[in-house]
Structure formats: structure tokens, C-alpha cells
Amino acid sequence: MAETTISTANRVKQWDDKAHIEYIRANRFKRYMGSNENSIIQVKEDLTKKRGDAITIPLVGALDSSGGPNTGSSDLVGNEKALPNDGHRIPVGVVRDATLVNVEEEQASPINIRNAGKVALRDLQMRYLRNDIIGALGSINGVAYGTATTGQKNTWHDGNSDRVLYGAAAGNFVAGDHAASLANIASPGDALTGDLVSLAKRTAQDAVTVNGDGIRPFRYGEDMETFVMFVNTKAFRDLRNWMVTNKFWNDAMQAGKDNPLFSGPTSIHWDGVIVREIPEIGVISGVGAGDPAIDVAPCYLCGAQALAAAWAMRTKSTTRKEDDYGFRYGVGFMEMRGVEKLQYAQGTDEAKDWGVVTTYVAGVADA
């Protein structure tokens, strides 16, 4: 009797799929990722099934309601409404890395160094993805914040004037000058508080969108809506201290438990916003008010389709072929993906961040 055996290729594929799912699930941003237009981070895997070096995410605005409906007193033919739409193109590229060990070192190690290498590689994948998401949140019209020129920052600043906030007052915004606006942020007056979170939420609701009603929130349940704000440790500290001082802390922790975006001690629920601590979000050093100038912490209030992550190739395990007659063992991973903040009118001076209100607050170090 002949028994069926699973081919090596199929075994590897099963391991690859498991590794991909585990690495996505363990990622700090996982609960905000999903495949539909309601997700904070929309995931697309269309290119895993067909050729291409980029994927376009459709962005659809609301139909214009300003003129009211057709009441039957005139023909509808010829008076149909155009559906506002655009698309954000996300190029994909290779992301890979590997680790190498030889037989002698493996023998000397008290741990299973090969398995440890796989675990370490998965952690590295998660850090790469996390860093790319953080970089996308802070990007200036597709350019990394740290490398964007003054002119590029000012163009983004003016183009997104209805969805960028400098400290606790809308008046801190200086037209045409991103740096001067940052210099208006002071401590402690512009530290993150519940009032400032509420201001950021109102900014999202009032943002000028394509025939719409502000930045679209994440929806859950029958009619519940929420935003999520990603903040660094210093901003999270200031908000927590404000809530404890004003005796809001316990109520806020209880209120968030029914929200699918709430993540326990690393989240604070306030006024329909889940504020999520992401320690790896850095500060912009020495750009705020004062002498010396204080550090400023960027915070990102996000609605639906704030970002997108596109995969052309899921995580694939790789091994080194050049093994020096079995003396060296190399294992790695490879995937093809891209992560970007979505924009309407991408690539133009009128480009707008589709689902993000960027909020800059005081980010001073602990005393």
C-alpha cells in the first residue's frame, strides 16, 4: 500500500503562511488592520495573485447633498451626480533579512540556535513593519519627515491646514510656516490633555472632505463610531496624569472595554477616541517654544483608511544555499510590501491626508 506524503514545497508553504499570520497578529498595530474600507489600516493582498509593482487604493468621497434630492418636478436623466473618487498608488518593494550560524557555534550553544534565529527574525519583521507604519504616519506628502525639506513641509502644512493642529489652540497655526507653528508649542500649556484630544476629534469632524462630513471614523456595532490616536510615551504620560488629576482615569478605563480598538493599559478612552501608546513614536527635538526650545511629540488621530499596507508576496522563509559543505546554516525571510499614509490628490500640491489629523504637542522629558 502506497502512502501519500506531503512534498517539501507544500510543507514550506504551510510554514510560510503560519509565519506570516503570526507576524501580523503579533504586530503592535494588528487590531487596527483589516481588509475593508472601514479599517484604520487597510490591508490589500491583490498582488499576491497577479503581477504588478504597485497597488492603487480607491478613495471614494460622498455624493453632493447641497442641492437636495430630486423631488420629481424635473428629469433625473442628465442631472445625475458624479461620484467623487481618487486613488492612492502604493509601490511595493522587497523586505528581507537573514541570520547565519555555523556548526561549531551551534554545538557550543546551550540553546537551539536555529530556532532562536527564526524567533528573532520574526521579531525583526514586526519591528520593520512597525517602523514603516510609524514612518508613514509622519510622512510629508510621501516623503519621510526627517528628510523632507522646509519647502515640502510648508506645502504639506498649508495643504492640510484643516487637519493639522499645533498644541491646544488652533491659533498656533502660522500660514506658510511649519517651523514657526511648531515654535508656538509650549510646556505645560500644550501638553496632551483630554481637552486637546477632543479638539483633535472636532478638527477631524470639521475637516473639509470631498462633499463629505469630515474625516470618516471607524464604525463598529450598529451605530458606534470611534477614532484612534497614536501617541508616544511622553504624550501618553501627560494625558494619563491629566486624567488622574481630574479623576477621570477609572471611568475612562471602564468605558473603553466595549470598544474593539481598546487595548487595556496601553489605551485610554476619551470622548469617542481611543488614545493608544506607541513608545517607538519619537519626538522632534528642540523645535518648540522656550530657550532652550522644548521637544515636540507628534500624535496621529486616525479615522478609516488612514493608511494602507499592500503585499505582493507574503512572508516567505529562505535558506542559504552556500553552506560550505554543510558547515554553515543560514535562515531568513523575504516579503514584498509597501506601507503608506493615504492621500487624496496624491502627488499634487493639493494633496490631503485622507484619514489623519496630525497633532503636535509638548513632549518634554521626565523631570
Over which residues does each language-model region extend?
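Residue-level detector of alpha-helix boundaries and kinks
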Residues: 42, 105-107, 316
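N-terminal low-complexity, intrinsically disordered "leader/linker" segments enriched in small/polar
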Residues: 9-63, 113, 132, 138
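Generic signal for short, ordered secondary-structure residues
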Residues: 36, 78, 99-100, 144, ...
